[in-house]
Structures are given as structure tokens and as C-alpha cells.
Amino acid sequence: VKQIGDRATVMRDGATVGVFDIASVTKEELVESMIGRAVQARPPRRHNPGSGPLLHVRRAAIPGVIDIDDITVGRGEIVGLAGLGGAGRSTLLATIFGDRKADLDMTLGDEHIVSLTPRTAVGLGIGLVPEDRKRQGLFLEQSILRNAAIAALTPFRINPMARAREVCHPPLTRLGVKFASVDQPVGLLSGGNQQKVVLAKWMARGIDLLLLDEPTRGLDIGAKADLFEQVHA
């Protein structure tokens, strides 16, 4: 818009909220008008040396797919994985979550792990926000509440859905998920709000290690800022 436009009309929630002269308006002003609040494209950099090791992957190998050794994550650290598409990032995260069979040797806290399933991983305090949230992270026809509570429902033996509302309301509110009712299908939400529900699922459960695979894909700048803020929290 800044490169080819003369004027910009910004709409939000079905209404015009501003008309701007491209020569004088800043990118930040346009974004604030679109989102309804000021946002940072990137959160301020924070140095966190961690408080001791949490995860140590000594080996994670699938013949012809990945061959990884010596990855360490400290408690409180944010560790990024970089690489081109197909480099193995998603496969490694799926392996750590127990969703891919592999030659595995890793330690999580005091637990030595050589074999893992997703059920066991969740029990150990590992959560995964997958790259394809619609196919792998959500039950689109189920309610927002059921999706947010699904990882935490098992311990609720008595009146589970009432307990789910109590446990899931704080993370949904904290993440700023926009919905008419927690009983509406999660598939009706925007991509950014769907991603927040996936994240709320693990916040409701309470985990030690959160694996994020392309977490900002398909999100608008406001949803990205919200996600960055929670990851840094």
C-alpha cells in the first residue's frame, strides 16, 4: 500500500475507521487503526539464561529423515530452530512429542526417555502447537471449550465440563480470544483466534515444555503480537 497507493481506507469489524493519506501516514498508524490498539511487530528482546537444563536431546534419528544430536533447552529459555522447508524442523518437534517413531535418547528434567507416545509426552509435561492447526491441533466441529479443555479433561472425574469452564476461562481471557460463546464451534473462529485456542489448551493443562511449529503462520500482525507476548511471559 505504501509503495503504490495514494490513500488508504481502513476497515475494522465491518465499518470504516479511517481514511489516510499515504504520503503522511506511518505504517505503525495504519496497523494501530487496523487492530484498534498499538502493537509491536516484535517484542523487546529479553535475555533469560534459564534456571538449569530442562530438555537434553542426545539423539533423535529417523533414517533418511533426521539425524539430530545434542540439543539442550534450559528452563525458561526460548530456543529457535532454523532451516529451509523440509529441513526436518517439524519432524524433530513431532519426535520430541512422541508423534514420530525414532531412535531416541533424551532427558526431560530427571526423566530419561528412549521411547515416547503423545499420551506419555503430555503426561511428562510436553505440549505441541503443530504447523497445521486445523488438521492436527483442533477438532473444528467441536466447541471452543472442548478444544481448550481436551488436554486437561482426564483428571476431572466429577462434573468435567463445569470444571473445564473454570480451568479454561483464564487462559482464553488472557490470550484475548474473541468469541460469542465458548460453546460455538472453534472452526468458526479466525485463524488467529484458532491458534490462541490451541495455545490455551496447553496453558489450561499446565506444561513444562511447549513446542511451537510455525506458530505465526497465517496470523495477522495483532495476533502475532499477542502470541509473542504470551511466549515471552
Language model features with spans:
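Glycine-rich phosphate-binding loops of nucleotide-dependent enzymes
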Residues: V1-A233
